[in-house]
């Protein structure tokens, strides 16, 4: 059975666990006498082999407040691990990423609260998530979570960060707890029609998102609030097709795809000079993508697709048009002859005539008819960046090939 084959690949071995424990020993020595806990998928036993980020949370009394975490707590942690290979990262508040033996350890300051619904920062709920999941999943259930995570990774809908807008690890765990196993999740997801409500606990507020899973440890929060409708639809379609024709392609899609260039494709390569929070950068990138598409349509271009990909430092925006060539002039459709606005139209326009339909028309010059210029003007990044732009001529990297192909390999 395909699921058993996949599990052999993704389930960590005893050797893998020992390697992680060695890394954790180094961290434990550094954080000695602090109130800290290992959290995340490693602690819950739902982590994937060769895909390990360890989450270590350092807790401080809730009375010290959020500002304390950003300054004092962060400095306290840095002073203890400064001899290790570390970088600063940014979410709701800064945290530290330590790299030991190619294993990333996220060390996150948090506030110690009595229950998940008393959380002051988003990460304060984490130990309650861990407790809930470990008390509701047996060993087989953990393997079912692993299958669901790998399936979602394979089809590109895993990850709650703004760049992806997909399912978090916690969401996959709750789906398995609710439905029972991987296959049952797919069977139900294949029939989804939004709004979808999955209630392990009664919600404490009304949610408006397309997929609603109230958090069992904080029912005022929707665990899947960040999941986009596009990713819900993709998951539902993938579930339907996998159940019809199971294939390892869903879990590990082919990396090499070939596709010819259709239409005209503008490639914008952005290199960011400054480090910033991934969610902040990708919030601005997503706004840029929407703005570029709207602006091009307003100027008369027929837009096929606009997408972005990359990390926090190097980002590619691809713009696919039916054609990059557009006339310098365009037909401006005016009011009917009996309209009260005809004088205003005549005053503001040249080359005016009355059409056979009794409507006024004019010829107008476009303010801008170069797609590359329009696209560049509508990038709204607030950090400094360098840009390289060109029209695609030849087949390039696989991400561009995926953009051109559109159809995921698991679908066709």
From Swiss-Prot:
One Pfam short name: CAA_C
Cofactor(s) needed by this chain: Mg(2+)
EC number: 2.7.7.72
Keyword RNA-binding appears in the UniProt entry: yes
Catalytic activity line of the entry: a tRNA precursor + 2 CTP + ATP = a tRNA with a 3' CCA end + 3 diphosphate; a tRNA with a 3' CCA end + 2 CTP + ATP = a tRNA with a 3' CCACCA end + 3 diphosphate
Other noteworthy facts: A single active site specifically recognizes both ATP and CTP and is responsible for their addition.
Name of the protein described by the UniProt record: CCA-adding enzyme
């Amino acid at each position: 059975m395909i699921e058993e084959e996949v599990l052999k690949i993704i389930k960590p071995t005893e050797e893998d666990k020992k390697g992680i424990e060695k890394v954790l020993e180094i961290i434990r020595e550094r954080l000695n006498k602090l109130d800290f806990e290992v959290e995340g998928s490693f602690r819950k036993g739902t982590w994937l082999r060769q895909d390990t980020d360890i989450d270590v949370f350092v807790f401080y009394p809730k009375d010290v407040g959020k500002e304390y975490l950003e300054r004092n707590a962060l400095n306290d942690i840095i002073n203890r691990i400064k001899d290790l290979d570390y970088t600063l990262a940014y979410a709701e508040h800064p945290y530290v990423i330590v790299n030991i033996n190619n294993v990333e350890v996220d060390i996150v300051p948090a506030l110690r609260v009595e229950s998940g619904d008393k959380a002051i920062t988003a990460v304060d709920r984490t130990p309650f998530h861990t407790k809930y999941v470990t008390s509701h999943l047996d060993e087989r259930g953990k393997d079912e979570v692993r299958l669901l995570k790998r399936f979602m990774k394979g089809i590109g809908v895993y990850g709650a960060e703004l760049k992806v807008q997909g399912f978090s690890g916690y969401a996959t765990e709750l789906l398995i707890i609710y439905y029972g196993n991987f296959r049952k999740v797919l069977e139900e997801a294949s029939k989804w029609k939004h709004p979808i409500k999955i209630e392990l606990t009664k919600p404490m507020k009304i949610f408006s998102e397309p997929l609603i899973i109230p958090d069992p440890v904080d029912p005022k929060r929707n665990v899947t609030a960040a999941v986009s409708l596009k990713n819900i639809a993709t998951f539902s379609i993938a579930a339907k097709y996998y159940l019809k024709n199971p294939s390892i392609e869903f879990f590990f899609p082919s990396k090499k795809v070939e596709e010819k260039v259709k239409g005209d494709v503008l490639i914008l390569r952005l290199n960011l000079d400054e480090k910033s929070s991934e969610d902040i950068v990708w919030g601005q990138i997503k706004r840029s993508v929407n703005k570029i598409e709207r602006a091009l349509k307003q100027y008369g271009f027929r837009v096929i697709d606009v997408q972005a990909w990359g990390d926090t430092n190097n980002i590619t925006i691809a713009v696919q048009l039916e054609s990059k060539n557009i006339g310098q002039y365009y037909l401006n459709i005016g009011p009917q002859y009996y309209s009260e606005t005809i004088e205003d139209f005549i005053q503001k326009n040249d080359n005016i005539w009355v059409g056979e339909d009794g409507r006024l028309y004019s010829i107008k010059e476009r303010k801008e008819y170069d797609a590359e210029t329009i696209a560049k003007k509508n990038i709204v990044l607030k950090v400094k960046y360098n840009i390289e732009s060109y029209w695609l001529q030849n087949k390039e990297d696989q991400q561009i090939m995926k953009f051109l192909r559109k159809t995921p390999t698991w679908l066709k």
